[in-house]
A protein has these predicted regions:
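Charged alpha-helical initiation segments
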Residues: 1-28
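Helix-loop segments that flank and shape redox-cofactor active sites
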Residues: 14-21, 43-60
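Hydrophobic packing residues in well-ordered alpha-helices of helical domains and bundles
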Residues: 23, 30, 121, 125-128, ...
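Short, hydrophobic, well-ordered secondary-structure elements
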Residues: 26-49
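A structural signal for well-ordered alpha-helices, especially hydrophobic packing surfaces
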Residues: 38-41, 45, 129-132, 136-139, ...
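Secondary-structure edge/capping motif, primarily at the C-terminal ends of alpha-helices
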Residues: 44, 48-51, 139-146, 172, ...
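Flexible secondary-structure boundary motifs
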Residues: 53-123, 130, 134-143
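Amphipathic, Lys/Arg-enriched alpha-helical patches that create a basic surface
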Residues: 152-187
Length: 187
């Protein structure tokens, strides 16, 4: 014979819907995915364009990496879309002017895209910056997490956000592989 306590342990719990805890978990996943995306951008951008004196090339690269690490996602996207990913016809161009005395070097690696693909990627990345900023700075202002319906709406928005940043991360990973292959070919 079983008592009521045993029955409660073995019977399935009815779906209680979306909770604030579910939303918090998904929010954390979104933020972590955005950080992974940002770190991948930093890894690419820190080394795609390097200029300096050939007397101290390691110092130049260290400085470039340090400068890149301090940039926000918005600045990184701006850098990526003006110097790493470029539309056909603008390859080899760089806004950066380096004035050095003596022997110097400049290394610039770019991925050239058809104009329509460049425009699509640029719009997607600008939208990602806006989405990330909205999540980080306004999520609680825009969502009511005190009700099940509010949590459900927040969860749906986070699922869409996670899907978008995951697709962007996967696309950027593909570009990073192209970058690594080109770097290896040059070395």
């Amino acid at each position: 014979m079983t008592n009521a306590g045993d029955r409660e342990k073995t019977q399935p719990v009815p779906d209680s819907g979306c909770t604030k805890s579910d939303v918090e978990h998904l929010f954390g996943k979104c933020i972590l995915r955005f950080q992974a995306f940002e770190l991948l951008m930093k890894a690419i951008l820190a080394q795609h364009r390097v200029s300096g004196s050939d007397a101290q090339p390691k110092d130049t690269l260290t400085r470039q990496v340090d400068d890149t690490q301090r940039k926000t996602m918005g600045l990184l996207v701006g850098d990526m879309m003006t110097s790493f990913l470029v539309p056909e016809g603008q390859q080899g161009q760089s806004d950066e002017t380096v004035e050095l005395s003596g022997c110097s070097f400049t290394f610039l690696q770019q991925i050239v895209l058809p104009p329509d693909e460049f425009a699509r990627i640029e719009a997607e990345h600008r939208d990602l910056v806006a989405l990330r900023n909205s999540l980080v700075h306004h999520f609680l202002e825009e969502r009511d997490l005190r009700s099940e319906a509010g949590c459900h709406g927040a969860r749906q928005a986070l699922v869409v956000a996670l899907d978008r940043v995951s697709r962007a991360y996967n696309d950027l990973s593909g570009l990073a592989l192209e970058f690594a292959a080109a770097s290896k070919a040059v070395a």
